[in-house]
Amino acid sequence: EDVTLMGLSAGGHLALFTGFKNSGDFEFSCKAKIVPKAIINFFGIVDIEDNFNFLKENRPFLNYINIWIPPNKTIQEISQKYSPIEIVHKNVPKVVTVHGTEDRLVPYNHALMLDNVLKNRHLLITVDGGEHWRFSDEEHLAIKKQIDEFMVKEVWTK
């Protein structure tokens, strides 16, 4: 019952997507019986199309999202179906997002999108100048402390 999902980058996207789907009234083939109490998202993709366009413009040689799109689908179809931002609902678990402002693979605005939509169900931990998982030891310690405090106050005592 005390399940927390956590993921980094693509894993963050999957943790958000799975947690949002499993906590809502969605029917899908691999729905779990247990609803997670929280999701810890490290710089995960929130909007697939937005990330695709960001990479297309800024790092086209690293646009890994291209391989996610089957020939018979569009980026819009895939994004609408698999972007966590598209399936936010009132019963989503509490979410912690850790994101660096200088991330060049998943733009920081994805963290801001979640923060704007989830409001009091979300803790945004911003790493000023942080890249995609390029944080110092001191930043890691500060992140861990904030996550621990959030989990104790908002998740484990409820």
Model-derived segments and their meaning:
Residues 108-158:
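C-terminal catalytic histidine-bearing segment of alpha/beta-hydrolase fold enzymes
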Residues 83-92, 109:
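Conserved serine/cysteine hydrolase catalytic core
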Residues 3, 95, 122:
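Short, conserved active-site loop motifs that form the nucleotide-linked donor/cofactor pocket
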Residues 40, 96-98, 125:
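Conserved hydrophobic packing residues within short motifs/helices of P-loop NTPase cores
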Residues 47-48, 102-106, 133-134:
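Acidic catalytic loop of the alpha/beta-hydrolase fold
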Residues 1-54:
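Primarily recognizes the serine-hydrolase "nucleophile elbow" in alpha/beta-hydrolase
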Residues 91, 96-99, 103:
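Short beta-strand/loop motif that positions the catalytic acidic residue
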Residues 50-86:
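Mobile cap/lid helix-loop segments that gate and shape the active-site cleft of serine hydrolases
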